[in-house]
Design a protein with these regions (language model features):
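Acidic/glycine-enriched connector segments
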Residues: 34-50, 54-57, 64-226
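Short, positively charged and aromatic/hydrophobic N-terminal segments
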Residues: 13, 17-18
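Amphipathic alpha-helical oligomerization/scaffolding segments
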Residues: 21-22
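C-terminal functional extensions of proteins
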Residues: 217-241
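Intrinsically disordered, low-complexity regions enriched in serine, threonine, proline
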Residues: 9-12, 33
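Extreme N-terminal basic, low-complexity initiation segments
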Residues: 2-9
C-alpha cells in the first residue's frame, strides 16, 4: 500500500496530488459539457413555479456539502456531522432565518431537508441552481420542502458559487457552514470572506482542503471538528438567528 501511495504522490505533497486530481476531473467535466448540456433541461422553463427572490428580512444560512464537488467526488454525511446539523436545526428561530443550499440535493444539503421534515421544522429552504440541470436534479428540486429556487446565470454548475456571492454575500450578512467539498467549496468560502456582507464562516477541518483554507484565512473563519460543540458557538456568534 505504501508503494502504491508513493507512486501516486510521485514526489508531490498530498495537497499537490489532490489538487492535481481535481484539475483532471475539472478538465473531464469541461470535455463532457456538450454531452451534459444535451441531456439537461432549462431550469427557468422546467421549474418556473419554484422561482423566487431570496428573502431580505431573514438571515441566510448556507449549508455547503453535496453540491460543491468536482466530477467523481461524492459527499457522504458522517453520523457526527448529521448530529451537528440536527442540533443546529433544532436551535434556530425559523422566523428569523432561512437555508440556502446548492442544486444537487445531496449530502448535508439534502440532510437539511430530511432533518427539517423529521423535526417538522417549518423553515424556509431555497436553492441556487445553474441555468441547466439534469432531469434527475430537476426532480429532486421539485421536493415540496424546497420552497424556491434562484437561477444562476451560470450554465456550468461549478460556477454557481459566483451567484451565492452576488445574491447573498455582497448584499447581506450570512452564516456559512461548510461541511464538505473540494475546489468549488473553497471558492464559496473565499467569496463569503470577500463579500461586503461580512458573513460568519465555519468550516469542517476534518476535510483536508477546508482545513488548509481555514489556515489561509485564519481570523476570518472558524474551523471545527464534527465532535466539537460548534452549534453553541454559532448561536453565540450570531444571536440574531
Amino acid at each position: 500500500k505504501q508503494k502504491y501511495f508513493e507512486k501516486f504522490l510521485d514526489g508531490r505533497t498530498i495537497r499537490e496530488a489532490i489538487l492535481s486530481e481535481e484539475e483532471k476531473n475539472m478538465q473531464e467535466t469541461t470535455e463532457d459539457d456538450e454531452l451534459r448540456i444535451v441531456n439537461s433541461v432549462e431550469t427557468e422553463k422546467e421549474l418556473k413555479e419554484k422561482i423566487k427572490t431570496l428573502p431580505v428580512d431573514k438571515v441566510p444560512i448556507i449549508i455547503a456539502g453535496g453540491s460543491f464537488n468536482t466530477k467523481g467526488r461524492e459527499t457522504i454525511p458522517s453520523e457526527d456531522g448529521l448530529k451537528v446539523l440536527k442540533d443546529f436545526i433544532q436551535n434556530i428561530d425559523t422566523e428569523k432565518v432561512y437555508f440556502v443550499i446548492g442544486h444537487k440535493m445531496q449530502g448535508y444539503e439534502k440532510a437539511v431537508i430530511d432533518i427539517s421534515k423529521e423535526l417538522d421544522k417549518k423553515v424556509e429552504i431555497d436553492a441556487i441552481v445553474p441555468k441547466l440541470v439534469t432531469e434527475k436534479v430537476k426532480d429532486r428540486l421539485l421536493d415540496e420542502k424546497v420552497k424556491g429556487i434562484c437561477i444562476s446565470p451560470e450554465t456550468e454548475e461549478l460556477g454557481i458559487y459566483k451567484s451565492f456571492n452576488y445574491e447573498i454575500f455582497e448584499r447581506r450578512k450570512a452564516v456559512v457552514i461548510a461541511f464538505d467539498g473540494n475546489s468549488p467549496v473553497l471558492n464559496l468560502v473565499q467569496e463569503a470572506k470577500n463579500g461586503k456582507g461580512k458573513s460568519k464562516i465555519y468550516v469542517n477541518q476534518e476535510n483536508e482542503l477546508l482545513k488548509e483554507k481555514a489556515d489561509t484565512l485564519e481570523g476570518y473563519v472558524v474551523p471545527f471538528e464534527m465532535k466539537d460543540n460548534i452549534v453553541d458557538k454559532i448561536i453565540e456568534d450570531n444571536p440574531e438567528i
